[in-house]
Amino acid sequence: MENVRIDNGQSFDFGKTASEYAKYRDIYPKELYDRLSALGIGKANSVWLDLGTGTGAIPRGLADHGANIIGVDISSEQIEQAKNLSEEYKNITYMVCPVEKLKFADNFFDTITACQCFWYFNPKIVVDKIRQMIKPNGLFLKLYMSYLKDDPIAKESHSLVKEFNPNWVGGSPAVQDLKTHYFDNPIMDSFTIDLPFTRESWHGRIKACRGVLASMDTKTFERFEEAHIKILQQLPEQFTIKHKVFLTYYIITK
């Protein structure tokens, strides 16, 4: 994938990170799921579409509530991982499709979510598509969760990625997306939380980011990995990383 608005047009492919995503990126905290549930996301017998679902972490986190869930992603590798991880959930269906090419009936979904991904889409197409697919007074929610660079461990890892991949702009597209509203009457919420990691799981989390396996060539990645492991060897086996979670949601009237 290439996007002139992201990483100075540098190509990236989350399919290359699918196994790391499956193993290391399902780190969303219970507090997030509690907030999503309080908004009615995942409620029994509702119909919920998760855009850019990746390995399906968010749908799995609320699948027991009884919604009928469809997760879509452009990456076949990510969807393969999602299916493997979701075998026990008969109420989740996954499909490979660019969001811009989705075809569902009008007024089909009670809820549409876009977690860690809305800035990758073409809003000129996707905004109208959301309006078409969602039911009157349906809920559309965008989610962004990131480590905070004032956390010393996160700062060092982030700086190392930038050293090996100068085109990577980190979460800048997401920050801009937080300020951009395509629907009326946005409701915004956020909270900070310390998430637990081991040296292995933090290394895996960083490998899965857009700036590492998704876009580095093999030799660059090998040099990055060697340098990152050296940093991690100076840390205790277990530690926490400060994160911030941003929620923006809209009731879509028609």
Predicted segments with their positions:
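A short beta-strand submotif of the Rossmann-like class I SAM-dependent methyltransferase core
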Residues: 114-115, 123
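A short acidic, Gly/Pro-enriched loop at the edge of an enzyme's catalytic core
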Residues: 100-111
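Conserved catalytic/acceptor-binding region of the Class I
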Residues: 131, 135-195
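Conserved class I S-adenosyl-L-methionine
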Residues: 1-43
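Short helix-loop-beta connector
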Residues: 41-47, 105
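Conserved Class I S-adenosyl-L-methionine
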Residues: 124, 180-254
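A short, conserved alpha-helix within the catalytic core of class I
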Residues: 120-130
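Class I SAM-dependent methyltransferase SAM/SAH-binding core
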Residues: 47-49, 55-101
